[in-house]
Amino acid sequence: MRIYILPILIGLGLILSFNFCKKEESNIALKSTTPILDPSYNYVHTSRFQGQVNPNEPLDNVLTNAKVALGRVLFYDPRLSKTNTVSCASCHKQNFGFADNLPKSIGFNGQLTKRNSMPIINERFNFSFFWDARTRKLEEQVLMPVADHIEMGMEDLNKLEAKLEAVNFYKPLFYDAFGYSKPTLDHIAKALAQFIRAIPSENSKFDQAIGLGFSNFNAQEVFGMTLFREKANCNSCHTIIHSLVTFNKTTLLPTNFLVNGAMTGSGYVSSSSFGGTNIGLDKVSSDLGMGSGKFKIPSLRNLDLTAPYMHDGRFATLMEVIDHYDSGIQNNEHLDDRLTTNNKPQHLNLLPHEKEALIAFLKTLTDYTIVQDKKFRTPFY
């Protein structure tokens, strides 16, 4: 009998082991709730930036409330990941200005992403995406994390169509948005893109100051604004393009204060046509980014919400960022010329009270209303 029992036990063990592994792989623990959508929410609005920067909306994907509502559900739905555990919102959290509070985000299988999650606000006026600016179209960008082998794991995107088609609540949402109830990759991408485009950030203290002649700024914030333009020279990268407001008779408003920045001509000036720069984080760049250790120049909006900072999330505070530019720049062979003096890394020699003033000014660029806006919260309750 023992001769026969052993194979049976081994076979049973293999079956149990296989089923356990299969369950671990698929991880089907989904929320049982369906989305609750408020039809009174209006996402179609005129931005204060329209007329200053052209929106990146393609002609075949006009912004509508129905598309944004569908995109909102997709954005928060973990079904878009292979294991039904990770959604777009897992790495772009409303409480943190639609960025992540981790240096690197956690993917569908527990692995860490290669870079820090960039905030997704005012993307309606952005024309390059990711730290390496690998795409210029938001409709292309939105599906790349879904298919990424670390982030969401749906490497065969065609399976996503069938997966969502099996979810009953999607049928009317797709029909309302596109007049066609069956999910398609094209419509998934368009809806996600429109939800992201609809997320605004235009009510910071700085925004309010534009119409008030900066009379709402305290002395420290005014001093920090002056440092930004002069001694700290921040606006050599976060640059001046549009004359939305005048600081003084000769200095105009750096566009990247207001919007997420775009390619050359819409927000960035750089030796790279994609608005990237090597800022001397390391003597030798382990991540080459756009090439030679260059990374996209990010928006300065909502900095008080979006820590940690840099492409790898290495700095936990704004003070650490300022200390880097003040005296921590490494002499990388590809170091941007704007960060050098006499062919050596710059030393700004900022005093402690100047650093505090610079931080005070940078915080005026944060729109705290975005973390409270119910229109952009999860619809799954």
Label every model-predicted segment.
Residues 6-12:
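Sec-dependent N-terminal signal peptides
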Residues 26-144, 208-316, 320-323, 331-334, ...:
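Short glycine/threonine-rich turn/loop motifs
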Residues 1-5:
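Positively charged n-region of N-terminal signal peptides that target proteins for export
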Residues 23:
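Short, conserved catalytic or interaction motifs in soluble domains
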Residues 149-154, 163:
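A gly/proline- and charged-residue-enriched helix-loop-helix capping module
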Residues 17-20:
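C-terminal motif of bacterial Sec signal peptides marking the signal peptidase cleavage site
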Residues 182-219, 223-228:
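Anion-binding catalytic surfaces of enzymes that hydrolyze or transfer phosphate/sulfate esters
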Residues 157-176, 180-202, 296-298, 304, ...:
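C-terminal capping alpha-helices of c-type cytochrome domains
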